[in-house]
């Protein structure tokens, strides 16, 4: 019996498609092999890229779709050097090209503009030179473009403004010149995206272009006037103070008992669970570690390797098979149905938050009983450990480093709030969560471990996450967090940097001082005892005006009403010297008017009116 006509056509179509697929695979394989021959690979990362294998989908660091077409190339942080090749433009279905943190040099091929399905182009932390290709403006699906920390020159192509899908742009730390485009998608980006390009000018930077009119000053800050009954602010302050003090005692007493109990508690035992990996789980460029690999790295999660403990679990120091040091965070969470999917989602979101001042997630591990995150090891520890737990043989953090930490951590938090989609609220900003890399640059850690923010401005959680002394009053009383929750915690962290003190310290009771650092600082300001504020470890080696500015920023960040606190992007600008004086003066006027409306003296009126601007240098550098 003759075969049905449709079957004949199906066979013919299959015969046509199979050779076409082979041709595509050959073309993509040839393109990737050309890249390999142009790169120096000291660690044999590209060893599996065998040109005799027709299909590149079997190669490591290459991901294909169901049609055996290359959609992802992941070669980040692989110690590669050499140059890119124009043949990369033949990978027509490529969505992710990850070549960050290598030593690749030369120019960026204009043929990359042919990759019209590209979603992410990450070439940062390399040695690229020459211009940014104008052809990149053809990548209309591009969401992430990070070319920072190279040596790129020339102007920024205006064609990039047509990429309406662009969400993350980082061109900082290059040698770019000319005017920064301000139309299209570029209207969304702040000067952080273009920082440290001395020859750039225009609205996207802090300096006008030659011949252009000077920038208009920003409008004065006019916070919304809350509608409330007379005296409600005072009563609210009293209630907030009572809640904070009560919470302090509530946490302190059980903490003492728990510490005593832990001394008696037998050592916990770790049960070895076979590493079960789901081959279907792919989370971008993140490496999925086996549980056994991390057990070996941490000596079976030995107590001697514990770097710290926190609300999310313990952190262990580990050494991988390649000799690199890592910090392994072993999460403690209750296993619930659907928890695996939630974990994958949160890990993916964390991995997409890439910034100089954010701790980069290196990989993860997921088994039926374990959730682990792997980060680079920070040899210089945290700001908290450097302020209060450093060995006598090590010098204290100098004032210049503290200033750099303040600015770097502010930039990292601003990135989480303004450049992540959905935005990420940290919810536990404190000195212990600001880590220090080998150059003592601030690196914000532990972000994204709490529930991620959605597109709304606030998020109500079932449990308050945070540390006493750092928790904003509205978060403590309502469980309602927002960006301004992080701003409050950041302000407390600034006071830690200035004073060297803990945010919550029962030891201060011995001197009849406040246990809360914020209250202690306000008390000293009220009594005009500013000489007691600055960390004695600095030994007068600081700049008075900068100390005054940092105190002002800290107090603006820790205002009782979240609506009156600045956003982190504004904090960055104030730390860079833009707008602090105006904001401080405006805030003082508002406080004076508020006192008059309430027909009663504000409990902090003396230190509000006597701003640190009116203090003489001798008052900050006197005897301690």
Curated annotation (Swiss-Prot):
InterPro entries: Kinase-like_dom_sf, Leu-rich_rpt, LRR_dom_sf, LRR_N_plant-typ, Prot_kinase_dom, Protein_kinase_ATP_BS, Ser-Thr/Tyr_kinase_cat_dom, Ser/Thr_kinase_AS. LRR repeats lie at residues 91-115, 117-139, 140-163, 164-188. Residues 1-25 form the signal peptide. Residues 26-237 are extracellular. Glycans are attached at residues 103, 114, 127, 149, 175. Its main location: membrane. SMART domains: S_TKc (SM00220). It catalyses: L-seryl-[protein] + ATP = O-phospho-L-seryl-[protein] + ADP + H(+); L-threonyl-[protein] + ATP = O-phospho-L-threonyl-[protein] + ADP + H(+). This is LRR receptor kinase BAK1.
């Amino acid at each position: 019996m003759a075969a049905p006509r449709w079957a004949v056509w199906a066979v013919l179509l299959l015969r046509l498609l199979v050779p076409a697929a082979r041709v595509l695979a050959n073309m993509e394989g040839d393109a990737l092999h050309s890249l390999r021959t142009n790169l120096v690979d000291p660690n044999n990362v590209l060893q599996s890229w065998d040109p005799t294998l027709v299909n590149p989908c079997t190669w490591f660091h290459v991901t294909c779709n169901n049609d055996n077409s290359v959609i992802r190339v992941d070669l980040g942080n692989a110690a590669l050097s050499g140059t890119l090749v124009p043949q990369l433009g033949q990978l027509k279905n490529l969505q992710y090209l990850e070549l960050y943190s290598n030593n690749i040099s030369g120019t960026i091929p204009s043929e990359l503009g042919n990759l019209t399905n590209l979603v992410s182009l990450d070439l940062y932390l390399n040695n690229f030179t020459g211009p940014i290709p104008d052809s990149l403006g053809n990548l209309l699906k591009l969401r992430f473009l990070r070319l920072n920390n190279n040596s790129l020159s020339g102007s920024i192509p205006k064609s990039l403004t047509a990429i309406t899908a662009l969400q993350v742009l980082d061109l900082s730390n290059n040698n770019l010149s000319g005017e920064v485009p301000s139309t299209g998608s570029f209207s969304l980006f702040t000067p952080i995206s273009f920082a440290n390009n001395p020859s750039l000018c225009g609205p996207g930077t802090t300096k006008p272009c030659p011949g252009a009119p000077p920038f208009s000053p920003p409008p004065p800050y006019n916070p919304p006037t809350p509608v409330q009954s007379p005296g409600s602010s005072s009563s609210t302050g009293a209630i907030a103070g009572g809640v904070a003090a009560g919470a302090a005692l509530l946490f302190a007493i059980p903490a003492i008992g728990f510490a005593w109990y832990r001394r008696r508690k037998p050592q916990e035992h770790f049960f070895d669970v076979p590493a079960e990996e789901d081959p279907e789980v792919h989370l971008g460029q993140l490496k999925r570690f086996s549980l056994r690999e991390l057990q070996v790295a941490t000596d079976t999660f030995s107590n001697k390797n514990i770097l710290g403990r926190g609300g999310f679990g313990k952190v262990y120091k580990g050494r991988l098979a390649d000799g690199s040091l890592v910090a392994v965070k072993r999460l403690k969470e209750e296993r619930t149905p659907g928890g695996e999917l939630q974990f994958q989602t949160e890990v993916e979101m964390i991995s997409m938050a890439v910034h100089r001042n954010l701790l980069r997630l290196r990989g993860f591990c997921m088994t039926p009983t374990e959730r682990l995150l792997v980060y680079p090891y920070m040899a210089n520890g945290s700001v908290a450990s450097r302020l209060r737990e450093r060995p006598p043989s090590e010098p204290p953090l100098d004032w210049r480093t503290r200033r750099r930490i303040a600015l770097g951590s502010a930039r990292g938090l601003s990135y989480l709030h303004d450049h992540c989609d959905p935005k990420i609220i940290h919810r536990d900003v404190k000195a212990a969560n600001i880590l220090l890399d080998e150059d003592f640059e601030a690196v914000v850690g532990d972000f994204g471990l709490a529930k991620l923010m959605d597109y709304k401005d606030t998020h109500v959680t079932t449990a308050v996450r945070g540390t006493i002394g750092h928790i904003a009053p509205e978060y403590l009383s309502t469980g309602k967090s927002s960006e301004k929750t992080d701003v409050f915690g950041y302000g407390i962290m600034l006071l830690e940097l200035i004073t060297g003190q803990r945010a919550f310290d029962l030891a201060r009771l011995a001197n009849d001082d406040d246990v809360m650092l914020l209250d202690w600082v306000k008390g000293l300001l009220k009594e005009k005892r500013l000489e007691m504020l600055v960390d004695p470890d600095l030994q007068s080696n600081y700049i008075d005006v900068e100390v005054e500015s940092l105190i002002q920023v800290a107090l603006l960040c820790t205002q009782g009403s979240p609506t009156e606190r600045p956003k982190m992007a504004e904090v960055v600008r104030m730390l860079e010297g833009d707008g602090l004086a105006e904001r401080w003066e405006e805030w003082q006027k508002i406080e004076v008017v508020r006192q008059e409306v309430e027909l009663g003296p504000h409990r902090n009126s003396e230190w509000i009116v006597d701003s640190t601007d009116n203090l003489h240098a001798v008052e900050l550098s006197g005897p301690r």
